[in-house]
Each structure stands twice: as C-alpha cells, then as structure tokens.
Amino acid sequence: MAAAESDLVIGPDYAPAPETRVAAGVPVGAVTAFTLYSGDSKFYPGIARIENAITRRRDPYGNRIAAAAHEQSMPLPYTRTVWVYVPRQYERGSAAPFLVAQDGYGYMKVLPRVLDNLVAQKRIPALVAVFVDSGGGDAQGSERGLEYDTVSGRYSDFIEAEVLPRVVAETGVTLTSDPNGRATMGASSGAAAAFTMAWFHPERYGKVLSYSGTFVNQQSPPDPATPRGAWEYHDHLIAQAAKKPIRIWMAVGEKDLHFDDPEETWHNWPLANARMAAALKAKGYDYRYVLAKGAGHVDPRVTEATLPGALEWLWRGYR
C-alpha cells in the first residue's frame, strides 16, 4: 500500500457519516446482555486504586507516577456487563466473524447502527460484535488500567477463556477461529488493549481499530520487561520482532492528551501514535494512520465521521 494511502490528515471540520444514522428498511441486529462477576474470574479477581499520597504523586506535567501493586491497589470485587450484537443476516450454525470492543458501553449507541447499515450494504461481512466493559476505574492502580495498559497476553487470554465462551452460551452463535475474521477495537487505553491482544496473540486477532491509543507509559504496576509500558511498542518492540499478520487502523487527535509534553515524559498521545505509525510503516505493516486536525482525546466528532470507513477498510477483502 502506498504511503499516501496509509497516512491521512482530516478535519478540522467534521460531520457524522451517514451510516451512523438509522436507515429505513435496514434489518436491525439483536442485542443480548449478560453480567460477569469478578469472583468467577481466574484472570481478574478485582482491584481498585488506593487514594493516598503515593497514588496522588504526579510528574511536572501532571502524569500519574506508577508504584508497586501493594502501594497503589487494594482488592475490590466488580461486575462487568457484556453486550452481544448479532446481525439479522447471521446464519445459525455458520462460523461468524466478530469484533471485540473494549469499554463496550461507550460504543453501544453508534456501533450497532453502523454495523446494521454496513452489513445491509454488503460493505462488511455479517459481524457479531462483543461489547465488553472494563472492571472499573481508570489509569494506574485501577482494574481498567490493569486490564488495558498491561503489555502482556493476559487480557487476550481473559477474553478467550471467560468472555467468548459465555457469548456462545448466551446467544447460540458460532464464532470463527480464523484470525482474519476476528477484530478488536477500543479508544484510549482500550485501544492499547486492542493492539496488545493482537500483538501477543496474532493467531487470534488479525485486525485492530484504535482511537487515541494509549501507546504511552501508563502500565501499572511497572514491569521490568517493558518499563515504559506501551511506549515500548514504537520504541523497539515492533522494530525488533518479526512482522506479524496484523492490519491496524488508527486515529489520534492533533490536540490529544499531553500534545505539548516533551518526549521524555513518554506520555504524549499524538507523538506516541505518530511513532506507532512510523514503526508500522518501517516494518511493512498494513496500516492506516489518521491525524485529526483540531481534535481532542477520543473526539466523538472523529469517531462518528470515520468509524464506518474504518470498519470497511479493516474488513476489505475478507471472505
């Protein structure tokens, strides 16, 4: 793919894509919901950040400073909701391609509508979508931070072992095992989690969709193997590893989080995402990088303007 097709600049004016609106006569997919309990999880029994002098520490630019797990977190049970969208066109017994969305509730308003329209227009296959909420909180010391910002295969293992079997049991769908038919997406730390799912298990996921990805130093608790968390991806992990069969679409706002912070903070979102794109390009990945002029962090204007096209781009050529 030519560089001109891979690196795009959009904005600063945005309008919702027509596929984000309800269209007359379009079949509407069914949505089922169920609850997961931390007490049943082998992967995530539940934590929450302790609010104390240690967790209130910040660097000169306002970024949290990570600490050891026992200093910043305490056990706390949680419940999480999972929603499953099944398109009307799904044929029972067939192995369905699917998409896992992190911070699932945040996509429940727009994504099913987009899928209804794109599937009806045959621009994407009849996707099942799995919307998974986090275990709660945000950033260092929290359950969400542990799940999404950790640079390991743990979260992917959790989805594979504890979420997808329940999806099958609750809905009766059959899910494909073909990584080309399995996508994962998210925004902010949820986007970092999506990439991490594919990076550590490309045999499971071959497609990633990222908005304002947290490819920065936010891993908590710290891991000596990746001391700067997801910043390590574009610093050296992508360059040093054999190319993996992953296709990624990613967008970041020009005025995203900490856009004017210096590099040495390892916490500048636009810089981190630009570096991700450069690392992917250098390694020959199939990627698309979108810089959204005038946009902020996980800017809803950008999501509504680009989501249909992003999904179509990710799923092009799938049979």
Label each region the model flagged.
Residues M1-R319:
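Non-catalytic cap/lid and distal C-terminal segments of serine-dependent acyl enzymes
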